[in-house]
Amino acid sequence: MEALLQLKGIDKAFPGVKALSGAALNVYPGRVMALVGENGAGKSTMMKVLTGIYTRDAGTLLWLGKETTFTGPKSSQEAGIGIIHQELNLIPQLTIAENIFLGREFVNRFGKIDWKTMYAEADKLLAKLNLRFKSDKLVGDLSIGDQQMVEIAKVLSFESKVIIMDEPTDALTDTETESLFRVIRELKLQGRGIVYISHRMKEIFEICDDVTVFRDGQFIAEREVASLTEDSLIEMMVGRKLEDQYPHLDKAPGDIRLKVDNLCGPGVNDVSFTLRKGEILGVSGLMGAGRTELMKVLYGALPRTSGYVTLDGHEVVTRSPQDGLANGIVYISEDRKRDGLVLGMSVKENMSLTALRYFSRAGGSLKHADEQQAVSDFIRLFNVKTPSMEQAIGLLSGGNQQKVAIARGLMTRPKVLILDEPTRGVDVGAKKEIYQLINQFKADGLSIILVSSEMPEVLGMSDRIIVMHEGHLSGEFTREQATQEVLMAAAVGKLNRVNQE
């Protein structure tokens, strides 16, 4: 089959690092090509070379059979290559239709914007995606999942021949994911080629026809998905067998450290639970169940309307994240790029940002040598892959950014560490490293709350699991009681903790 798009022998180097070496990718009409590899394998760099953001150092790009070089995203878009980025690229203050047709609005014969046509065309695109809202709604009023769907509608509006989807389901619910897959199947029937970049094995085996594997910037293999198993694909990605994906540390927890009684706040209704020293408490539930809201009320980012929180026997009141930090409660956000990291700052600055009081003299000046030593120790301990601590953190892979975010939380020497989706957007190899770090913290007696949408992760890592449903606690299970079935039953409200007991 003739490929719509072919990249062969692509090289790309940056100061101190060779990002791509002999990389290759083919995209075929009417087929979905998965592009997989650990974070830092070169997937994002390859997409930037393809769309003209980066100039390739060597190699060829064939588009519809002709050798081509795109000068930037606009030229690749106009040629018929659409890309849906992992980071949403929308303007919250504009309507959905205005976002979709930004810069190419429909104009009537008097030179004025034809709003009626524009909204009608945008509504058609939303209907194609089976979405329940109209295009006159402000993007800022949508959930992250719905905003992702608007991104997809925007790319569809260009009638692209090849569509690149970078982690498209990262923020989508199961229903939204099913809508996306329905659209992908429709696009295949229309003869479009799709590049599907994802870490989610289940999705790759469900929706993709072929898979290209990158490792350390090199092309490893192109295979038909049907010829592979999950284990064989992971082995190609990491270059080794992953024996035990969730390395649970079997160590009995200590005394109660945190006690939460009848906690209420935005999206949180009368929640009570305990957390022990050296315990990993998993928090499960569907998207919108109130898991993140519960954590934000707990550490002070959302207002607490009633209830009590006791830490080591003393009542704590957290009216702001600073109060949470001061009391030894650290929260690592699910959205590290919005809430967690300052992308323009260096690895060192990001890591030490909340712990500067430990490196400050009485007069307020910094003890730079102490700060550098601490950052250097954490980089080594966490195996953060970076050319230096002065590197801008935005240039690191997702897994390495996440390690820096966790290290920053630990620098403040917390008693309770809340990890909200700690492995979202992180590849299989880096996930295992993060799990091993979590176990290390547990062994040191740290109390950990692990919030995750990935049930195998919650089941594999937790000592005890609580489940949220519509702002309430709908279940609490020991490690032995917990299965995917009971967690899902509690998550949809079919089972409550009283039934279980």
From Swiss-Prot:
Keywords per UniProt: ATP-binding, Cell inner membrane, Cell membrane, Membrane, Nucleotide-binding, Repeat, Sugar transport, Translocase, Transport
One GO CC term, this protein: plasma membrane
Binding site for ATP: G37, E38, N39, G40, A41, G42, K43, S44
SMART domains (UniProt xref): AAA
InterPro entries: AAA+_ATPase, ABC_carbohydrate_import_ATPase, ABC_transporter-like_ATP-bd, ABC_transporter-like_CS, P-loop_NTPase
GO molecular function terms noted in the UniProt entry: ABC-type D-ribose transporter activity; ATP binding; ATP hydrolysis activity
Domain ABC transporter: 5-241, 252-495
Free-text function comment from the UniProt entry: Part of the ABC transporter complex RbsABC involved in ribose import. Responsible for energy coupling to the transport system.
Family the entry assigns: Belongs to the ABC transporter superfamily. Ribose importer (TC 3.A.1.2.1) family.
Protein name: Ribose import ATP-binding protein RbsA
Organism: Escherichia coli O6:H1 (strain CFT073 / ATCC 700928 / UPEC)
Annotated gene: rbsA
